[in-house]
Amino acid sequence: MNGRKLPDGGVLYDDTDESEDDIEVEGDASVAAPLAATVDWNAGSLNETGLLGAELIGEFVKRLPNSPGVYRMFNAEGDVLYVGKARSLKKRVNNYAVGRVHSNRIAQMVRQTANMEFVTTRTETEALLLEANLIKRLRPRFNVLLRDDKSFPYILITGDHRAPAIFKHRGARARKGDYFGPFASAGAVGRTINSLQRAFLIRTCTDSVFETRTRPCLLYQIKRCSGPCTHEVSDGGYGELVQEAKDFLSGKSQKVKSHMAEAMNQAAEDLDFERAAIYRDRLAALSHVQSHQGINPAGVEEADVFAIHHEGGISCIQVFFFRTGQNWGNRAYFPKADPQLSSAEVLNSFLAQFYDDKPVPKQIMLSQTVEELELLAAALSEKAGHKVSMLVPQRGEKRDLVDHVVGNAREAHGRKLAETASQSRLLEGFKETFGLAYAPQRIEIYDNSHIMGTNAVGGMVVAGPEGFVKNQYRKFNIKSTDITPGDDFGMMKEVMTRRFSRLIKEEGIPDRTAQVATPDAADMPFPTWPDVILIDGGQGQMTAVRAILAELGITDSVTAIGIAKGVDRDAGRERFFPPGRESFTLPPRDPVLYFIQRMRDEAHRFAIGSHRARRKKEMIKNPLDEIGGIGPSRKRALLQHFGTAKAVSRAALSDLMAVEGISEAVARQVYNHFHDDAAK
């Protein structure tokens, strides 16, 4: 079935270059999810009659009203084939039943339809928003599907502390403060924050670290922070720095730079060359930020610009983000769509899904018009709570901007075609090398990472015809207490057991007798069965892995291959352990060898990154984290009131009750936690 929830134990991979400034917030759900979750569907219940295809749809039409709404089409297995919306459900669905000539895609969908459901909505705009939300959640086979739909990163300047900090942020806006974005990539946010640190000397440490400082850290020494933790700068002076940073991010960059230039010149006139050099370096940092922004049209204050290039069965949609008159990056998308669809149809469906869980700007510019331009504008205006203008510029600065985005879309499309062709050849070579029945469409690569058994993490990365599928990466925190510290075999055994036990429970064991490859990994919701699993390990690891696969009864359902490091652990001398044959090596310049090395190295990188994140979290753990009922808000309130966790532990019950947001019951819980420990 499509549309299952992600497993509770699954952790989506956050593709960030740096994690030091990340704030991870749980509950980053689609803003429109409640809309879909509360839908009261009118089931067709016509599959009991044995009707299929156009005959079933014809019977279903008799029950449909002439009102706007959304309909779903199912196959015999209960998988959602298609989600559509209509101004008139009866007229729209009837088109599938009449004897008109359909495209191959529609004809195939109609033939497979074994059941249908519908729901009415008050307006067509409401139907459009619901349709987009359902397509993203259910990922129906015959719809245009938005891939790589990870949330965008923002810059957060906190507003709940005497010394605001600057962080990279993804997810729900749960913390008080000013959010600036969206940025196209985490790398762009990281570069911007680094430059803003040099320009405005704002802290990037967590509140718990801030409260425990007794002297300035290294960032103060290298002039990347003004040292508010130990009052190296007054609260008023620090507040001015923070306000300047907000002004710069709000588009008032010229005002900020002029103020700094005046201060630099004044310092030079006063012969205070050291202070003048500081202002010079801060100005250079701001110029560095702007140098990475590329094109910055003066007439575009807040807009997203979309351009599509459709060729060779692949569509590339390029998006540029402009906020406060600044270019905050761009990103290329490659939606899954039927090659017979026009570029306008692909773009139309893409736009509704794109803004399902993202803030909508005041203006959206397109490279070409779409059929439902006015309806989309009305729906997005209703969702955003402000007027959204959608236009296709014909001349002037905005047309030049759109042409620039079109050029980027064309270049990204060309690169994608080349990469896809190369990946296809490598997968075919992989098949020949290991004697597989078909070229694998989903390869899962596993690796463990730990230091003497501590903070052990298992990592899983996924590769397919379009490269690495990062939204399918998972990490497994090793939980078993029976594993001897440093026992790699035991750790891999736990990872395999958890991964495939859950998979069997939710998906069942696949029938591999047909020898047909699974769909492209990027198109399948998680969880789904892999064709091949690669294990970073030799004969010992593979013995443990194959024992688990045999115990679960899935030895014939998935091909397990081990990769042992070569002599002296040299790259290029790896030994492979496939099932049912002797181990072997590949020639040093074999493209398949490079392909496997790249997959193994990616699994290694991901596992190490997950381990480091877990270890870092363990190192900076605060004693307040161990108290049940003390979440981030109460923890922050206690630290702001008392300064340090040690001061909290020494506080009297009456002092704890005096903290804003701390009830008597919570205060008593905190007091008992520390004093019960002391008594022991």
Curated annotation (Swiss-Prot):
It comes from the Bacteria. It comes from Rhizobium johnstonii (strain DSM 114642 / LMG 32736 / 3841) (Rhizobium leguminosarum bv. viciae). One of its GO terms (cellular component) is cytoplasm. This is UvrABC system protein C. Its main location: cytoplasm. Keywords: Cytoplasm, DNA damage, DNA excision, DNA repair, Excision nuclease, SOS response. Disulfide bonds: none annotated. Belongs to the UvrC family. Interacts with UvrB in an incision complex. Gene3D superfamilies: 5' to 3' exonuclease, C-terminal subdomain (1.10.150.20), GIY-YIG endonuclease (3.40.1440.10), UVR domain (4.10.860.10), UvrC, RNAse H endonuclease domain (3.30.420.340). Residues 66-144 form the GIY-YIG domain. The UvrABC repair system catalyzes the recognition and processing of DNA lesions. UvrC both incises the 5' and 3' sides of the lesion. The N-terminal half is responsible for the 3' incision and the C-terminal half is responsible for the 5' incision. SUPFAM superfamilies: C-terminal UvrC-binding domain of UvrB, GIY-YIG endonuclease, RuvA domain 2-like. It holds the Pfam family HHH_5. Residues 254-289 form the UVR domain. GO terms for biological process: nucleotide-excision repair; SOS response. One of its GO terms (molecular function) is excinuclease ABC activity. It is found in: Cytoplasm. InterPro entries: GIY-YIG_endonuc, GIY-YIG_endonuc_sf, GIY-YIG_UvrC_Cho, Hlx-hairpin-Hlx_DNA-bd_motif, RuvA_2-like, UVR_dom, UVR_dom_sf, UvrABC_protein_C.
